[in-house]
Amino acid sequence: DKNDQKLNNIDYIFKQKESNDFSIIQVYTQLFELAEIEYEIAISCNRFYLKFDPDLFDPNQLREFLIYLPKSNIYISPNRIEYRATEAPDDLLGNYAMYIDKNLDYYFSEIILENKNFSKINKEILVNLPKNLKKAVINENRKFTGYWGILNRNYVYLSENEKTDFLIDYFTISGLDDKKVLKYQINNYDIDYNFRNQPLRINTKLITRDLVKKVDGKTILNVGKVIGLQSNLFNEDERINPIEINFPNEYYYDIKFMIPKGYKIANIHDLTKEKKFISVDGNVTAQFKSSANFEKNRLSIKISEFYNSLKYEKNRYDEFRDVINAAAEFYNLEIELSKN
């Protein structure tokens, strides 16, 4: 209760270990002053619900408090237990905020992501195909950092335990009609691991019949399915708003298929793709790139996909869409296996 006067007493807060959204700011600021650490209070709002307009100021925009440490360009979110001294929460990125220093001087500035490489998904996938090509065994190691780690740890934190049916399905390859999970191991899932951006690690093993099919006597391997379902963008209507993603992020896949001896691949060149978005300053700010090679019955595929900007120009929507859809197109890729 923000009207409870006891919660404005610093001694009471430390003794009872109880505070509210406002008094916890008092705790932090007094500790920073004692330690002679420079700080500012930043007040903003969720960008998905309200755009903070610094030119047409409205007090209703002052909805969420952050503590900004200017010397290190990091934020503390005192009312969100999943955040530590790190980047600002993703739903505040790109919004403006009112920054207030200890002398009560203020200014307006955009909340910026300091580390563009903060959020990554790394997947190592090993697929073993038996001689009869029926049941594929897939071993996968995943690592999530940044906002991906924070988001997925929240799912675990809000679940009954770290091994619910929902989590096991969520953290294994999506889009497989036939999937049996043989092993599921999750590490670093406590929210304390968000400190220093330590990766959330998930190791799984599953079997599926969904990767190989026969079509007109040909053996078809659904290579793309191992990356899981991907987003699509369509342009049926004229775009009105600028393009804004959840947060800058990166994906890396290291995929290996162990093919039974005696088989060759007819169309490996189909697995090489590249789509990119080049900003006006000449930098590549979004890209999907895949490459593949086949040697000694091992098909190796490497994929990198990244989005380094939070916002993209709406008049270049088609270029942005091509990058997004490249991953969806890869998911649908099939190659033909034929005997030597």
PLM feature segments, named:
Residues 1-340:
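A sensor for short, sequence-defined functional sites
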